[in-house]
Each structure stands twice: as structure tokens, then as C-alpha cells.
Amino acid sequence: MIAETIGWPQIAALLVLAQRGAEELYSARNTKALLAAGAQEAGASYYPVVATTHLAWIASLFFLIPATAPISIVLAIAYLLLTVARYWVIGTLGRFWTHRIITLKDAPIIRSGPYALVRHPNYVVTIAETFLLPAVFGAWALACIMTAVWTAVLMYKIGLEDAALAARRQPQLEPTG
């Protein structure tokens, strides 16, 4: 019975859930430290939408993809490379990486690592992951639907983030390296 309901899609969903749980702990620690240092949170009301969307994506992987779904090794490798990119983003931001929009007045705006290539690399990775993981298991409709939902949610978050950072994007505050 378990073998018929638990397969690679469900294992992948549980691994992603564990990974995101660990990231949430790191984010919460960074958030607490930044707020203690005088940082401000912007757009706090959007956060439950982001969290719910993310959990819905993980749940859809677990419940909507058959346990016996075929696996595309090429897409699985691409997804694993995105995981490396995710941790490159997290490592580049270090103590400033959070799930929430937290701004610390005199903190530098990071322009190194993936931020030298793309303005919002974490969101690019998230959207690509949202599409790729269901696609690994041939769940193309799920990949398209959840990617569209995530894209809408993240576009809203990007607007909030850009507005929160606008005052800090003055040329004299931009680091050179």
C-alpha cells in the first residue's frame, strides 16, 4: 500500500519541505537579528500569501503527482543545479537573507555573486524551481499552473521589495564590489 502511494514525487516533496523548513529557521534567525539591529519590515501582510503559496506547491507535488510518475533525469539534474543557485543566493546575502522584506538603513545593497547578474536572483530561482520539479515527473499542467501563481505572487513581492529599497538605491550608497 505505501509503495503505491509513496514514490519519488512524494519523497521529493518531503525533501523540499525539510529544506524549506531549515531555510525558514535560518530566515527567522536573520530576521530577529536584523530587527534587533534596528531594521524595519516592509509589506508584512503579504507574507502569509507567500507561505501559503509555497506550501500549496509542495502539497501539490505530494498529492497530485502519482507515485509511479516517470522521472526525467535531465530535468532532475537541472533542478539540482537550481538548488546550488539557491544556496549561492543565500550565501551571498548571508545575514541579510530572509523570507521577509527586512531593510537595515545603512546596510549595503548587495551587488556581488548572483546579484551581479540578476536583480532578483532568488525569485528567478524560485520560479524556475516551481516549474522544473513538477516537470521532472511529467506533471506539466501542475508546473504551468503553479508557476503562473508563483509568478503573480512574486511580482507583487518584488514591487514591495523595490519600494522598500528605493531610498537605499542612491548612487552614494551603492558598493563597488
Tell me the role of every PLM-derived stretch.
Residues 13-27:
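N-terminal signal-anchor/start-transfer transmembrane helix
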Residues 15-16, 60, 147:
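A short, structure-level motif marking secondary-structure boundaries and short turns
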Residues 2-17:
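Hydrophobic transmembrane alpha-helical segments in integral membrane proteins
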Residues 18-21, 59, 131:
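Hydrophobic residues within the alpha-helical transmembrane core of Major Facilitator Superfamily
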Residues 25-46, 70-177:
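Cytosolic-biased juxtamembrane loops and peripheral soluble domains of multi-pass membrane proteins
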